[in-house]
Amino acid sequence: MLRNPLFPKFKLWFVLSLSIALSWGMSGRAHEVAPTIADFTVDDGTLSMVMRLNAEAFLAGIDLDGLGDTDDTDEGAAYDALRQLDAEGLEARFLPFAADWLARVGVEADGPVTLEITGFDAGEMGDPRFARSSELVVGATLPDGAQEMVLSWPVGAGTLVL
């Protein structure tokens, strides 16, 4: 039986190539842009909204509208640096940012409504191959008798799923 001396080399090359391709695909998940997901409730005239978001992407100043990967932006390096923060470090940086950014989120219910931060959980870093999901909780008192509410999402904030 004849053996091809190139077959073991080809097999090694194939396995290495496959491993590299798979690791590139998995490591990219930390840079894939996901929508902000918000759940809101209104109870006795009080609005509460819980937003699950990528705090590091917002902090880095990335325009998330239509973006698929944070590596495709000039702010990608800043995003990578922010991803290295522990939960306390991210909270210390995000809360002052969020207080200013929240003014750009428009809520109207028989007139403008002012949102206030009522909680923030940076979330644990976990597996660095995946983006961290942080939770921002905001609230507001709605005017008596308000029947409709309109939410305006800021330009550059990416997709919002309610």
Task: List PLM regions with ranges.
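N-terminal soluble domains immediately following signal/targeting peptides that reside
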Residues: 29-162
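Bacterial N-terminal signal peptides
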Residues: 13-23
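N-terminal signal peptide c-region/cleavage motif recognized by signal peptidases
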Residues: 25-27
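Bacterial N-terminal signal peptides that target proteins for export
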Residues: 2-14
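Membrane-protein biogenesis/insertion across secretory and organellar systems
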Residues: 2, 16-17, 30-32
